Amino acid sequence: MCRYPHLPQTLPLVSRFGLRTLLLVLLAWASVCANGEAADKIPGLLTVRDALTLPNHPVRIDARLTAAGQSDDRPLAGVLLHLRIDGKAIASQTTNQAGQVSFDYLPKMRGTNVINLSVDPAATVSAEMRETTLCVWERRRPIVLVELESLMQPGAASSAPSAPAGSVGRPAAEPVPDAADELSKLTQYYYTVVYVPGSESASMGNDAAHTLRQWLVSHKFPPGFVAVPGTGGLSATLDGFKQDGWTTMKSGIGRTRAFADTLLQHRLEVVVVPELPKGELPRKAKGAHDWKDVRKKL
């Protein structure tokens, strides 16, 4: 007597339809199961800001996980997050009741590193992976602040770089000609750069830094620190840099009168590009016709 009575019936079935067909059916079944699991997951939003430190000095990388689409930014607790830096696994931690998590890291060398933060695949939350920047700078190197609006075509700043080129959503703002090349020359050997968004970042919510960073990368601007001003605005951001010991912040490049006025109040030199109409340029500010003229003014 056959020990497995169903086997004689199964073998002709496999022979009739072929092993390839059977494999396709199994793959389709697995795909349906996977999609069902994904549909059951809570959509989340990861937010993480750029980090700045010195070589051989510890830095804390803070992140937050909230429910996507929630107007109250409902925190998601108990979710395992994974941190990678330059592709290397560094640490894993679970979000607290506020949806927050902090990682401590000790960089050894000067440079710019890519921070990668992701939700564990087995978690009940599904969130897009986030990349941010770890800037490891030396204090003696001068810092130049660059207003985001000075990098965008006139008239495009109001639309904001809400999406990187090629992505779904509103068209991304186009960069000013020569801005990326000229800024790369400034930062190649001398300056480090801090990008400062203006009012356009308010409409992006918690995802502002990520959106702006994607836009900068997609248009080949040099890597730098993206400083999204908080409740105190740009003035409080500048005070924060100085309190942390970054006193080599000497100059800035911008487009608006408000940006120029703020930097002058903090005793920084500022170049406005393109030059504002006569009578609108602050007395101690310098005007540049275009980005190719900026280096001559610094």
Residue ranges of model-derived segments:
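Beta-strand-rich structural segments
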Residues: 44, 54-73, 79-81
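Short amphipathic beta-strand segments in non-cytosolic proteins
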Residues: 80-91
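Glycine-centered loop-to-beta-strand initiation motif
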Residues: 94-107
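Edge beta-strands of extracellular beta-sandwich domains
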Residues: 125-135
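Conserved, compact domain cores that house catalytic/ligand-binding motifs in diverse enzymes
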Residues: 139-231
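C-terminal cap/substrate-recognition subdomain and adjoining C-terminal extension
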Residues: 204-298
